[in-house]
Amino acid sequence: MSIASVASVFKGEHAVGSKVTVRGWVRTRRDSKAGISFLAVYDGSCFNPIQGVVPNSLDNYDNEVLKLTAGCSVVMTGDVVESPGAGQAFELQVTDIEVAGWVDDPDTYPMAAKRHSIEHLRELAHLRPRTNIIGAVARVRNCLSQAIHRFYHEEGFIWVSTPLITASDCEGAGEMFRVSTLDMENLPRTEAGKVDYDKDFFGKEAFLTVSGQLNAETYACALSKVYTFGPTFRAENSNTSRHLAEFWMVEPEVAFANLNDIAGLAEAMLKYAFNAVLTERMDDLTFFAQHVDKTVIDRLQSFVSSDFAQVDYTDAVEILQNCGRTFEFPVSWGIDLSSEHERYLAEEHFKAPVVVKNYPKDIKAFYMRLNDDGKTVAAMDVLAPGIGEIIGGSQREERLDVLDMRLAEMDLNQEDYWWYRDMRRYGTVPHAGFGLGFERLVSYVTGVNNIRDVIPFPRAPRTANF
C-alpha cells in the first residue's frame, strides 16, 4: 500500500488492482439504495476529485460514512479500479476509511456545495482555496512560478534575494510604506520639530521596497545575468481590480544588454511560461474556459504562436490619433498610454503582443537611459491582447553624468543613491532589465479579472485581514 495523490492516480501511476491511500477533503457524498456511498474527495493536486466507492460492509459505514458532509477530511484506502462512469478513468474501491476531521455544523459551513460569488469569497480568504476556482488559480500560479524559475535557470541566470526593507525609492514616486519601531504615541522630534529618525531602528527613514531592481542591478554588474522574484509594496490608495498594496514581481537584469535584448528576453520568458501552463495545467484551464473566460486557452495558444510586434511610442501615438476611434482619454504625445490605448494597439491594430519602445523621458523613471534625441528614454512596455501592459522595462542609464542630471530633474537626492551611483564609477557597463507584475500574469492566464482573486491573501486599502 502506498500514499497516493489524486493526480497520481489519474495519471495511471498506480496499477489497476493496487491498493493505495488517498488523503483529502470530501466535496460531495451520494448514497445509493444498494448500500453504497460515493464520495468525491479532493486533495488539491489536480482539478477533479477522485470517486471513492464505499460499501456498507465497513464497520464505520453507518456511524461515520453516512454522516460525512462537504469539508470533512478523510483518509481513504482502497483498490484502484477503472471507472465505469464518464469523466474520469479511475476510482477507488474503498476497503477502509478514517475520518480525520469533522465539520462542526454542516448547515453553517461557508464552503458548502452552494456556489458563492468570487467577491464573497474574498471575505473568506482562509477557506476559499477549497473552492474549484481558487484551487485552480493556486495551481496555475504555482505552475507559472516554477516555469519562470526553470526558464531563468536554463538561461544561466542567478536568482538574487533582494531586500524588502530599503532606504531608496526605486520609482521616485514616494508611494511607500514606512518601516519604523518608533512609538507613534510619543515620537522623538528634532529641534526643528520634525520626526527624529536618528532614533529609529535603522537610524534613518526606511520603507518597504517598491522594486528589487536597483539592488538587482548591482549583482548584474558582477554576475552578468540575474533575476529577482519576490514581494513588493506600493502605498497607492487605489481600490481597483488592477491594484494591490502587496504583490509579486519578476525582475531580470542583464549586463551588456540593450533594449532589444530584453524585449527578446521578455518574449521568450512569457512564451515559455504559457507553454508550461498549456502542457501541465490543461485541467484547470479547461475549467476557466468553461466558467470564467471562454477565450483563455485560445488566447494563450495564439500568444505562444505569435511574433511580437514592435513600435516606437511616437508612432503608436500617431496610430491612435489616426485610427478613427474616440477614446475616453484623448491621445497626445507626452501622455502615458492608458489601458484602452494599449488594448487597441494589441487587439485591433497589431492583433498580436506588441512592444512599445522609447517613451517620453518626463513620464518615466530616473534610471532609464536617455536617448540621443534628449526627449525620450530607452523604455519599453509589453502589451498583451486582452489585458494591455504586462511587462515594463528599460535599458538603464549607465553614464554617471546623465544619471546625476536625471536625479536632479526629478528632485531626488544624490546622497540617497550613493551606492547606485558607485556602479557608474567602477567599471560601468550598459545593462537592461524589466519588471513583470506576477499577479497580472496570473490574471491574464486564468481570465480571473480582479487581481485580488489571484493572490492568496490580498492586501489593499483597508484590506489586511487574515
From Swiss-Prot:
Compartmental location: Cytoplasm
UniProt enzyme class: ligase
Keyword Ligase among record annotations: yes
Family: Belongs to the class-II aminoacyl-tRNA synthetase family.
NCBIfam families found in the cross-reference section: asnS, PRK03932.1
Catalysed reactions listed for this entry: tRNA(Asn) + L-asparagine + ATP = L-asparaginyl-tRNA(Asn) + AMP + diphosphate + H(+)
UniProt GO cellular component terms: cytoplasm
Organism: Shewanella baltica (strain OS185)
Subunit structure: Homodimer.
Any one Gene Ontology BP term: asparaginyl-tRNA aminoacylation
Alphabetic keyword roster: Aminoacyl-tRNA synthetase, ATP-binding, Cytoplasm, Ligase, Nucleotide-binding, Protein biosynthesis
Keyword Aminoacyl-tRNA synthetase: yes
Major location category of this protein: cytoplasm
Protein origin, superkingdom: Bacteria
Annotated protein name in UniProt: Asparagine--tRNA ligase
InterPro entries named in the record: Aa-tRNA-synt_II, aa-tRNA-synth_II, aa-tRNA-synth_II/BPL/LPL, Asn-tRNA-ligase, Asp/Asn-tRNA-synth_IIb, NA-bd_OB-fold, NA-bd_OB_tRNA
EC number(s) from the headed UniProt entry: 6.1.1.22
Gene Ontology MF terms in the entry: asparagine-tRNA ligase activity; ATP binding; nucleic acid binding
Cited CDD domains: AsxRS_core (cd00776), EcAsnRS_like_N (cd04318)
